[in-house]
Amino acid sequence: MKKTLGRVIPVVSLFLFTAASLLAAGQAAPPTSAVTWPTKNWPKGTPASVGLDEETLKNFDVDIATGKYALTDSFRVFRCGMEVFAGRYQHDYAQIYAKESKTKGPLNARLTGSYNYFDPEWHPFYQGTDLHTMQSVSKTVTSIVLGVAITRGDFKASLNTPGLKYFDVARVKNVNDWKRQMTIENLLTMTSGMNSEELFYPEGSDAPENDFVHMEASDDWVQYAIDEPVVEEPGRNFTYSSAGTELLARIFQKETGQDIDSYAERYLFAPLGIRHHWKRDYVGTVDTEGGLYLNDEDLAKLGFLYLNNGLWENKRIVSEYWVKQSVAPHVPMPYTVEDGRLYYGFSWWLIPSNGQYAWMATGFGGQELMVFPRPKPDCSVHRVGRSEWRN
């Protein structure tokens, strides 16, 4: 039986597909003579100046403001290197937290602390900053940073390198031939064969079967992840695994001698003018599976970097080869939309849309970046917020 997208990712994805259809209905983007790089600020434009229907976007803005798309904090559209639509929506999260902390739900499986995504004490977005939890968008950014390190020659290992190379096997549980075969590429493409499935639990992190909540409750996330059983041959099937992405934090540190957050700051975030916060687990390992915080303008820069094949201010940040491989359809996902089957790249979701793939980075609670590559509209749409999972 086919699995539809609505069963497995937040309802806000419907919001982005609606946005995609609005953008696709617009005119082709007018030619630009030169790229204006938004390192300091995004240049401003109007929807009409880039072939989009302003009235449609205004109506969409009203729908967001009136709550049609759950607790949306911001919605922005970028095209031709300009911000052409921006909406920000205010919510009293202190009041929401006071209410939501009394009853468990998908966004607050633990009533206090880091498992409650309404808790202002744990999330910088609520503390007078504009840094917003990215959740599993962090996985996509982890892939980008890995590509930067490979491009620079700092990460020398092949993607076919077994992950166990970076661990003391004598201290790893459940070692079998399949775990020995599990490679870095398997971790990037969610084909590790690990015994972890997260997307079929609409109750979110409150589901007892949901693997990532057990990992995040453990003292050492990487140890939990590497101890996890590998129950099928790696490379055969897509199985979404936050634990697999967390292993990349250890692998990156061992291979480069640097933590991935400090490396990203120097070679990715600083050149693009990106401010960030990247949290760590209890033993100090960078939370590569869900711990990144960015603002909305800076998230859009990452989409723009990929639209420009890894160049920024005409300097090479990540190789064009890595960009193309990252958004190539490596493994079919067991989900479909109207235009066809979804695929997964190197931690990018690939959504069939008008004869090509839109590239999506998506995270729990409605953190989403969708990029529409050329020759169709060269555009990115970004939404951050809170949303329930749909059943």
Residue ranges and their predicted role:
Residues 1-7:
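N-terminal secretory signal peptides that target proteins for export/translocation
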Residues 4, 13-126, 150-156, 223:
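N-terminal leader/targeting segments and the immediately adjacent pre-domain N-terminus
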Residues 53, 58, 81, 130-159, ...:
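Active-site SXXK
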Residues 71-73, 132, 366-368:
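Short loop/turn microsegments at loop-to-beta-strand junctions
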Residues 87, 97-122, 160-165, 203-233, ...:
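Short, charged, amphipathic alpha-helices and their helix-cap/turn boundaries
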Residues 122-128, 133, 151-195, 227-230, ...:
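Active-site helix/loop module of the DD-peptidase/beta-lactamase fold
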Residues 143, 190, 244-251, 290-311, ...:
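Active-site-proximal alpha-helical segments within enzyme catalytic domains
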Residues 275-276, 323-380:
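Active-site Gly/Thr loop motif
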